[in-house]
Each structure stands twice: as C-alpha cells, then as structure tokens.
C-alpha cells in the first residue's frame, strides 16, 4: 500500500511538470522538450553515481538490523558515521565535478546546452541525494519502515508543491530548487530521527541495567 501511494504521488509530480510549464507560458512543444531534457538527460547524469551508494545502502541494511537486534548502539553509530561520510564525500566530489563540467557534459553527451545548465543546477543535490539513500536504509534497518515512508511522502509533497506553484510562476528553475529543498528536508529529518532513535535506545539500555 505504501509503495502504491508513493508511485501515485510520483506520477502526479511527473504529469504536473509539463502542465505547470504551460501555465508558466511555454508552448506545448517547449514544455515537453524541457521536461524531456530534464528527465531524460540531466537527471540520469546526476543519478548515475548513486548506483554506488544504493549498493552500499543495500549491504548496510542487514548489518544495521543485526546491530539493532543486539542493541549495540556504538556499532550502529560507527556504521552510520562511516556510511554517511562516504556518501557525502562522493556527493561533494560529484557536486564539484558536475558544477564545473556540467555545461561541457551537456554538449558532449547530449548536444544540449540546456542539459548542461540543468546538470550544473542539479549538482547541488548530490551530497544530500547520495546520503539520503544511506539514511533511508538505516531507518529501514532500525525497523522503522513507517518513518521512512512518512519522510519520503513529505519529501514528495514538497516536490509536488514546487511543481504546482513555483514551476508555474518561475518555470523550471522553481522545480529544480524544490528538488533540492526536498532532498535537504529528507537529509535533515532523517538525521534528526536517527539521532532521536539512538538516544531512546541508550536510555532504554540504561534503564534496563
């Protein structure tokens, strides 16, 4: 049920982007072209390195679950610290690379200067985007799938609001900035929840002893 709702929200987001670009004033062909450049060229570039973080996150989940079962807070903290540092390090490197080389990549790979502009703008998402895959896996590993669903849903709502309001008034830059805002939201709330959960575990173990 949760997965279906997320898919429905993602579909609403996808359908709303060209519609909001029409309201902004683009022609139908320009709106669809801009949407195609964003989703078919720029975003795949930004998401490509996340294959590494997604693989690492998949391996992280059972390790976190095991440590949670053992109530080993220190081990969980160590895994969280190392995984987040790795993701943020990769994300910062990709931010620098995509920001500096975005226009060149757009021309070289897609023969599109617009794709290059999008890659450069989206580069700011990289540290948060890559770290969030680890954060969501950690929350799953802690047995809190409902929390990860809630955070993902709220993040999607930020993007949908961005499409319906900011894209209609400011064009595609409005949507790109809301994409960044949604990833920052997911990152901050994920960190806050994990910190809260670990504090509760420590308190619980303290009272049990």
Task: Show where each model-derived region lies.
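Membrane-interface helix-loop junctions in multi-pass transport and translocation proteins
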Residues: 143-146, 156-188, 196, 200
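Interfacial/gating helices of multi-pass transporter permease domains
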Residues: 18-47, 116
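Helix-loop junctions and terminal segments of transmembrane helices
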Residues: 46-70
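Junctions where cytoplasmic loops transition into the N-terminal start of transmembrane alpha-helices
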Residues: 2, 35-42, 78-91
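Membrane-interface junctions at transmembrane-helix termini in multi-pass inner-membrane proteins
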Residues: 124-154
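Residue-level recognition of transmembrane alpha-helices
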Residues: 40, 87, 119-122, 126, ...
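Short membrane-interface helical motifs at transmembrane helix boundaries
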Residues: 93-111
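Hydrophobic, small-residue-rich membrane helices and short re-entrant helix-turn-helix hairpins
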Residues: 28-31, 61-81
């Amino acid at each position: 049920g949760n997965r279906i709702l997320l898919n429905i929200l993602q579909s609403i987001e996808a359908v709303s982007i060209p519609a909001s670009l029409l309201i902004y004033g683009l022609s139908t062909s320009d709106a669809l072209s801009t949407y195609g450049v964003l989703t078919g060229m720029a975003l795949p570039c930004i998401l490509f390195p996340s294959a590494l973080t997604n693989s690492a996150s998949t391996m992280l989940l059972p390790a976190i679950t095991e440590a949670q079962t053992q109530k080993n807070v220190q081990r969980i903290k160590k895994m969280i610290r190392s995984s987040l540092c790795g993701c943020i390090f990769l994300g910062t490197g990709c931010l620098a690379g995509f920001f500096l080389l975005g226009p060149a990549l757009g021309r070289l790979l897609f023969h599109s200067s617009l794709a290059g502009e999008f890659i450069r703008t989206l580069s700011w998402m990289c540290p948060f985007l890559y770290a969030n895959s680890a954060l969501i896996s950690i929350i799953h590993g802690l047995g809190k799938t409902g929390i990860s669903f809630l955070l993902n849903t709220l993040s999607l709502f930020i993007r949908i609001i961005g499409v319906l309001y900011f894209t209609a008034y400011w064009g595609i830059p409005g949507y790109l900035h809301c994409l960044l805002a949604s990833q920052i939201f997911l990152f901050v709330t994920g960190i806050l929840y994990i910190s809260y959960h670990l504090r509760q575990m420590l308190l619980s173990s303290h009272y049990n002893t």
